[in-house]
Amino acid sequence: WIMGHMVNGIDQIDEFLRLGSNSPEFDINFDKDAKPVYTYHGVPCDCFRSCLRWEYIGDYLTALREVTTPGNPKFRENLSLFVFDLKTNSLYDSQAGKAGENLADDIFKYYWNEGNNGGRAYMIISIPDIEHYDLMTSFKHYFISNGHEELLDFVGFDFSANDNIPDVEKVFEKVRVPGVPDRVWQSDGITNCIMRGLNRVKEAVKVRDAGGIINKVYVWTVDKVPSIKAALDAGVDGVMTNHPDVVVGVLREDGYKDKFRYASYNDNPWETFKAE
């Protein structure tokens, strides 16, 4: 998966898709009542990017629904996965559960159109604080209690703060909901302004390949060819980047084109493929 980084403007969705992204990532900000309000990153952000693009969440999720609903004039077949980068650090730990419920309500209303011919894409809910695990639990229970447990088949989760992998595993085990399979992506990374090694990525890949709780691994934010190749060599499933076209170019090179391919909608984002 080629994850387009910081796609916070509606017009940027098509821009990043044209560049080769099949998985836009966007930032979700919450108000003091734990209600998601708008897409926005703010300063500082990645080098050489505008940090100030934003949209109201209802408008943004509606736009995503349009480009992922077959039959809609705006439908784009190659868009298969979203990454919700939640900005919950402004919330108290005690508000995490309410934030999850409110987010689920907005996704159900604006993206899944209240269960009536909504969008078809998968999504990763990426949480920046491991102590905000109640967000995940309440998100799941929202759909179960409203009779739409089947929609959880399209949802996976990630903790994005580069926590120790064993700590992440313990939290996912703690919040398991009976009857709802674990669907876990593990991210690792840092802003493109700073270099970061791949030791933790390799640890996450090892857990994935050993049949652990991690299904997929992605790295962020990598823009340069050597960094992209190093991440692919480490066995990641996704690369988050400001330059999807650069990743597309790497995937076409000898040594990569036979080992990796561009993910389509028919590829299950919860299915584990081991590094070889």
Curated annotation (Swiss-Prot):
Mind listing the UniProt keywords for this protein, alphabetically? Cytolysis, Dermonecrotic toxin, Disulfide bond, Hemolysis, Lipid degradation, Lipid metabolism, Lyase, Magnesium, Metal-binding, Secreted, Toxin
Decide whether keyword Cytoplasm is in the record.
no
Q: How is the cofactor bound?
A: Binds 1 Mg(2+) ion per subunit.
Record localization: Secreted
Which InterPro entries does the entry link to?
PLC-like_Pdiesterase_TIM-brl (IPR017946)
Q: Does the keyword Lipid metabolism apply?
A: yes
* Gene Ontology CC terms: extracellular region
Q: Which residues form the active site?
A: H5, H41
Example of a GO MF term: metal ion binding
Q: Which GO terms describe its biological process?
A: killing of cells of another organism; lipid catabolic process
Functionally, this protein is described as follows: Dermonecrotic toxins cleave the phosphodiester linkage between the phosphate and headgroup of certain phospholipids (sphingolipid and lysolipid substrates), forming an alcohol (often choline) and a cyclic phosphate. This toxin acts on sphingomyelin (SM). It may also act on ceramide phosphoethanolamine (CPE), lysophosphatidylcholine (LPC) and lysophosphatidylethanolamine (LPE), but not on lysophosphatidylserine (LPS), and lysophosphatidylglycerol (LPG). It acts by transphosphatidylation, releasing exclusively cyclic phosphate products as second products.
Family label = Belongs to the arthropod phospholipase D family. Class II subfamily.
What is the protein named?
Answer: Dermonecrotic toxin LvSicTox-alphaII1
* Native organism: Loxosceles variegata
